[in-house]
Amino acid sequence: MALNLQGKQAIVAEVKEVAKGALSAVVADSRGVTVDKMTELRRAGREAGVHMQVVRNTLLRRIVEGTPFECLKDTFVGPTLIAFSAEHPGAAARLFKAFAKDNAKFEVKAAAFEGELIPAAQIDRLATLPTYEEAIARLMGTMKEAAAGKLVRTLAALRDQKEAA
């Protein structure tokens, strides 16, 4: 369906607003993926707080202009599905990585995080970022471990001191 100028401007404005609030973006090629599978992907994306949209490449170039995702411009070739993660930087990458594992025709092209282009081969860097809760849990575990280790060393020193006396 052909879009008129107002329709194109509305799409650019809407998606640019999403891009401004996003932490990361992932670009993929969904040629050959069935509509049912794409519907599942979109549903999973909504649940994960990921905004997904298929947009014309010329409009995408305008959308990412002046954003940290400008580095993705060269990947806008062929059918392009773009996903913006607003809540967690790795959400879209994790979603696309899992979907690509089950759907051979789905191809992740690249991702962008904090203005840095991440090639498809290195998408794991973004997909494996811990969520806020996971990061806090790891930090607390490390702090607990350090405190417990200090206690053990103190008790061992006391034991050694008593044995020496």
UniProtKB/Swiss-Prot annotation:
The keyword Ribonucleoprotein is annotated on this UniProt entry: yes
Molecular function terms from GO: large ribosomal subunit rRNA binding; structural constituent of ribosome
Swiss-Prot/TrEMBL keywords: Ribonucleoprotein, Ribosomal protein, RNA-binding, rRNA-binding
Pfam family, one: Ribosomal_L10
Keyword RNA-binding included in the entry's annotation: yes
One Gene Ontology term from the biological process aspect of the record: translation
A cellular-component GO term for this protein: cytosolic large ribosomal subunit
Family annotation (InterPro entries): Ribosomal_uL10 (IPR001790), Ribosomal_uL10-like_sf (IPR043141), Ribosomal_uL10_bac (IPR022973), Ribosomal_uL10_bac_type (IPR047865), Ribosomal_uL10_CS_bac (IPR002363)
Function: Forms part of the ribosomal stalk, playing a central role in the interaction of the ribosome with GTP-bound translation factors.
Subunit structure: Part of the ribosomal stalk of the 50S ribosomal subunit. The N-terminus interacts with L11 and the large rRNA to form the base of the stalk. The C-terminus forms an elongated spine to which L12 dimers bind in a sequential fashion forming a multimeric L10(L12)X complex.
Similarity comment: family membership: Belongs to the universal ribosomal protein uL10 family.
The protein's name in its UniProt record: Large ribosomal subunit protein uL10
Annotated source species: Yersinia pestis
Gene expressing this chain: rplJ
